[in-house]
UniProtKB/Swiss-Prot annotation:
It comes from Xenopus laevis. The keyword Amino-acid biosynthesis does not apply. InterPro entries: Thioredoxin-like_sf (IPR036249), Thioredoxin_domain (IPR013766), TMX2 (IPR039101), TMX2_thioredoxin_dom (IPR037463). This is Thioredoxin-related transmembrane protein 2. Monomer. Homodimer; disulfide-linked. Occurs in both reduced and oxidized monomeric form. Oxidative conditions increase homodimerization.
């Protein structure tokens, strides 16, 4: 049973793992993250490396390298406690593995450390995380169409995400937001997105800082009657976002999506009944 459970977990996650491996970003990032392990463990590359082991074996970790790797594992576990999606878990592993690799390579040789940093910089400049391309029921706005749509029908409630493609938090939240749009979208409750990286004037209009240090991306705002009534995350006096986890459960609870959805459905039903009643009255008059 102890062997069966992990095996079933791997089989269940196999489609997602294959999807990641098929993406150049994840494949190259995995190779960079495991590069020190490969160099230290795989002959003949490891045979020419310096070592501080008492037995002089260059193809095994010395005590300092083991300490660094154990510290890396502890940091990853701490960071992953707040991760929401599998992509965030994998991203944390990749990021901190590269940091640890940089330290380990510099311990071996200055030239190897510089080469590794160069490869990481080239990777960051040429490879971007794949954007979410799954099903969704979301309308994308520009700086002009956003205001027009918010004012067009006061009976419709809008939840709008302000995002930037370069933000890893926005990328992680994309599948969650798409799933919410598929579940709750109706005639009286709609979902939208606007890219403040492309339309910076929108960020000024709604007081959303695009700076990574502000941690305001993504920002969700609920509009009713053309006015903002609620947003997450909130911003303190210093302009920094108050910590808030963009989980599906938090969005549903904080934005009262279940209640908004039921109200929107009732309004729609009432409108349809009124239309049918008017059509029936018009038909009687014609007779």
């Amino acid at each position: 049973m102890a062997v069966l459970a992990p095996l079933l977990a791997v089989l269940y996650a196999a489609p997602g793992l294959l999807r990641w491996v098929s993406q150049p970003y994840y494949l190259i990032s995995a190779l960079l993250s495991a590069s020190f392990l490969l160099v230290r463990k795989v002959p003949p590359a490891c045979s020419v490396l310096p070592t501080q082991r008492e037995d002089g074996n260059p193809c095994d970790f010395d005590w300092r390298e083991v300490e660094i790797l154990m510290f890396l594992s502890a940091i990853v576990m701490m960071k992953n406690r707040r991760s929401i999606t599998v992509e965030q878990h994998i991203g944390n592993i990749f990021m901190f593995s590269k940091v640890a690799n940089t330290i380990l390579f510099f311990r071996l040789d200055l030239r190897m450390g510089l080469l590794y940093i160069t490869l990481c910089i080239v990777f960051l400049m040429t490879c971007k995380p794949p954007l979410y391309l799954g099903p969704e029921h979301i309308k994308y706005f520009s700086d002009k169409t956003l205001e027009e749509e918010m004012q067009s029908d006061g009976r419709v409630s809008w939840i709008v995400e302000f995002f930037a493609n370069w933000s890893s938090e926005c990328q992680s939240f994309a599948p969650i937001y798409a799933e919410l749009s598929l579940k709750y979208n109706c005639a009286g409750l709609k979902f939208g997105k606007v890219d403040i990286g492309r339309y910076p004037e929108v960020s000024c209009r709604y007081s959303i800082s695009p700076s990574p240090l502000s941690k305001q991306l993504p920002t969700l705002i609920l509009f009713q009657g053309g006015r903002e009534v609620f947003r997450r995350p909130q911003v303190d006096k210093k302009g920094r976002a108050v910590s808030w986890s963009f989980t599906q459960e938090n969005v549903i609870r904080e934005f009262n999506l279940n209640e908004l959805y039921l109200k929107a459905k009732k309004i729609r039903k009432h409108q349809e009944e009124s239309i049918h009643e008017n059509e029936w009255n018009d038909g009687k008059k014609d007779q």
